[in-house]
From Swiss-Prot:
Enzyme Commission number, as recorded: 2.3.1.274
InterPro entries: FA_synthesis, Phospholipid_synth_PlsX-like
GO cellular component terms, semicolon-separated: cytoplasm
Name this protein carries in UniProt: Phosphate acyltransferase
Originating species: Clostridium botulinum (strain Alaska E43 / Type E3)
Organism classification: Bacteria, Bacillati, Bacillota, Clostridia, Eubacteriales
Broad EC category: transferase
Length: 333
């Protein structure tokens, strides 16, 4: 498997990118990585490690697209940027997938415009995997499409179901529609119309509306929504988890000695919970519906996060998720 890596994407690039790639190569020796970015900077970082030289290839790219640039304009203007060169490697079928922790807007726009959509897919969607009490769940769309149509959400449900089925070995993943109430008549025009379409779609295991308070249980495998609501729910969930853990720490500091000793006994359990909510463990979010394996890593990813993003890309590839999505949409054309 060959993976294109945006060597200058993210707050900690290129050091964290190179660290993650070298670390992953120790575990996945069959892989080959193409890191895009200024050759001198990437070479300097690589010189710190011992690795098989034929397994990491540098693709020189002089420019970088920052997060404050207009995504589409930057993609058109900066043809020699690390992200554009990485995307072209996938477009030209030189690489099987791409990972970037750079500008989300530029990455998503680039995946759509350069790599291209799968035939039949109206809008690609971002689908991060999150930890739930009784299992992982996917939120799709989590921010790629702020404005959506009911038909788009049905497609998001299909792509999310295919991903979840093949990656987590769940034969019939459940799909819930993010809404303000469980009843069918609740919500706005978008959710009401989407509910009707999902209920009629035989290829989806639609279980009805799901309120945000029930998302963390993990009982529903795929939470489908427009990008605005999905991104809001995702960030609220991430923020709540961090704040609850922070509140526990604050209370421990104020507690008496006896209580602190009790907390020490719980430390292994608390560590496991904290690990579940650490974005580094998940690597990144798949961008579903484009004609390639595209993984968006967190902007502040470190070496560990990049390594796990590589692992996630490998799982996507080995489980033929891309081909399965293509097959589903070929039926409709």
């Amino acid at each position: 498997m060959k993976i294109a890596i945006d060597g200058m994407g993210g707050d900690n690039a290129p050091s964290a990118v190179v660290e993650g790639v070298v670390s992953a190569l120790k575990e996945y020796s069959e892989m080959t990585f193409y890191i895009t970015g200024p050759e001198d900077k990437i070479s300097l970082e690589l010189s710190k490690y011992d690795y098989p030289k034929d397994k990491i290839i540098i693709i020189d790219a002089k420019e970088v697209i920052s997060t404050n640039e207009h995504p589409v304009m930057a993609l058109r203007r900066k043809k020699d940027s690390s992200i554009v060169k990485a995307l072209n490697l996938v477009k030209d079928a030189h690489c099987d997938g791409i990972i970037s922790a750079g500008s989300t807007g530029a990455f998503l726009a680039g995946c759509t415009l350069i790599v291209g959509r799968i035939k039949g897919v109206e809008r690609p969607a971002l689908g991060p995997i999150m930890p739930g009490r009784r299992g992982n769940f996917m939120i799709v769309d989590a921010g790629a499409n702020v404005d959506s149509k009911p038909e788009y959400l049905v497609q998001f449900s299909k792509m999310g179901s295919i991903y979840y089925k093949n990656v987590f070995n769940v034969d019939i993943p459940s799909v819930g529609l993010l809404n303000i109430g469980a009843e069918e008549e609740k919500g706005n025009d978008l959710t009401k119309a989407t509910y009707k379409l999902l209920k009629e779609e035989n290829s989806i295991n639609f279980v009805g509306n799901i309120e945000p308070r029930y998302i963390p249980t993990g009982d529903t495998n795929i939470i489908v929504s427009d990008g605005f609501a999905g991104n809001t729910a995702l960030k609220m969930y991430e923020g709540s988890a961090k704040n609850i853990l922070g509140m526990i720490k604050d209370e421990v500091l104020k507690a008496d000695l006896k209580s602190k000793i009790g907390v020490l006994l719980l430390k292994p359990f608390l560590k496991r919970i904290m690990k579940k909510f650490d974005y580094k463990e998940y690597g990144g979010a798949p961008f579903l519906g484009v004609n390639g394996i595209c993984i968006k890593a967190h902007g502040s990813s470190d070496g560990k996060a990049f390594k796990n993003a590589i692992r996630q890309t490998k799982i996507f590839y080995e489980n033929n998720v891309l081909d399965e999505i293509k097959k589903e949409f070929e039926k409709k054309n």
